[in-house]
Amino acid sequence: MVRNKSACVVLLFSLFLSFGLLCSAKDFPGRRGDDDPPKRYEDCRRRCEWDTRGQKEQQQCEESCKSQYGEKDQQQRHRPEDPQRRYEECQQECRQQEERQRPQCQQRCLKRFEQEQQQSQRQFQECQQHCHQQEQRPERKQQCVRECRERYQENPWRREREEEAEEEETEEGEQEQSHNPFHFHRRSFQSRFREEHGNFRVLQRFASRHPILRGINEFRLSILEANPNTFVLPHHCDAEKIYLVTNGRGTLTFLTHENKESYNVVPGVVVRVPAGSTVYLANQDNKEKLIIAVLHRPVNNPRQFEEFFPAGSQRPQSYLRAFSREILEPAFNTRSEQLDELFGGRQSHRRQQGQGMFRKASQEQIRALSQEATSPREKSGERFAFNLLYRTPRYSNQNGRFYEACPREFRQLSDINVTVSALQLNQGSIFVPHYNSKATFVVLVNEGNGYVEMVSPHLPRQSSFEEEEEQQQEQEQEEERRSGQYRKIRSQLSRGDIFVVPANFPVTFVASQNQNLRMTGFGLYNQNINPDHNQRIFVAGKINHVRQWDSQAKELAFGVSSRLVDEIFNNNPQESYFVSRQRQRASE
């Protein structure tokens, strides 16, 4: 009787416990509390495994947990309150804010996210403690801890955040470059003729990056690359052009309405080709590419230029084929069949030499094309060409050289108002900070690696080329508020990159520690600016302009004694223009 009574008591207690578990599953004190339904669902389900008897009772318990927490779990994963989604949305909102407010906004997002990470770590510790207190068997305890770790330390959004944090370490430097309107990566060029034997590519318009470059938007820059033993088809262009050879050797021939000019070209040779002149080229070398930077000043559309090919097949076509036969036959005094043969060509011959802008040529043909060519010297009396590197460097010492040809000195450049320059920096050397008073320089990296640092006012972001009047007024007001505030623009430079230095923006170029840096540049002027007397003003080095200030001006400007100003700005009496980073580090 006593045994039966005891059994009844045990049975009643078990039923009561099961009923209480089913009714209070949602109130089970899980490891995270009310703000984590997914975890509470896991706690509830695991409790069903521990405290229920029989498979049916366990299934009923788990169904109750699922009905209370399972749906919430799925909703939570797609709700914007999810930490990772909330962080991403926060960052996205920051990107839409003004540039000056963006860093503070991003910092707030990061701080909030880090607080949630700390909370997650605390919850993991609580979960782990719960496992040690509730689980008795070692295998269950290990399983419990493993589930805690998966929930709080190895979840996907935490791993994404860690990867994002690694990216943010380099984002500060890369962000300037990615949003830098003055740095044109070599991929900024668009190929017009990309063929087996060569490539002709054009840089995007300068003002497409930012309105501050509108002053030089009438110029376009292109790069012509011809493979060894390659001929470039004759063509003329609706633009005034300057050819600047940066690599290889070849022959450049062009015909004006009066004369034929032919030049042997090597790095440093500058050739001025008037608009409408028919020009063709040949790469004389058997191994190296002939690479030429071509500056265009269009005469029709200031934003666009076109090439016209008298001979061609498909791409490019001969522009003569656009005329009707009723015009061509009497104009050339020839039969229609001969015209078909001329413009169609022999199929086998076309297949052998190619059909594009660039044609493979024999060495005999290349030599014949260069027989009448002359080699430009410094000025050499040539009407249209000279070699920039044959003249005396404007600045030079053991760390570098700078060559320059200005419109007032070279008649080849006077009517187009362009300065041509070349910079050679030895490894580990610096072209000291300076600025140009009138010229905006477009610099092309020809060889080596390095970087550029430039001081820029805080400029508004470019929204569109044609801006609304209201946007312009807002930008003008913002510029006035930020007057006298600057930011550093730093860009890594490698072969093929373009960097634009606006007039009066202080700038410095630095060669890498293990490579020389070789660059060429075009100094461009706004059409309303007289290019004469552009001044390059140095702010460091032996001839920096601060040395010439009055003592009182130095003291009032810097707020220290003029002696200290002189000590700093006169501290490099032997070096001008170029200095070595190695020597400065050795003195430290």
From Swiss-Prot:
GO function term, MF aspect, one: nutrient reservoir activity
Residue ranges, annotated region (Disordered): 159-183, 460-487
Keyword Endoplasmic reticulum annotated: no
Signal peptide (from-to): 1-25
Keywords associated with the record: Seed storage protein, Signal, Storage protein, Vacuole
Localisation per UniProt entry: Vacuole, Aleurone grain; Vacuole
Function in brief: Seed storage protein.
Protein name: Vicilin C72
Native source organism of the sequence: Gossypium hirsutum
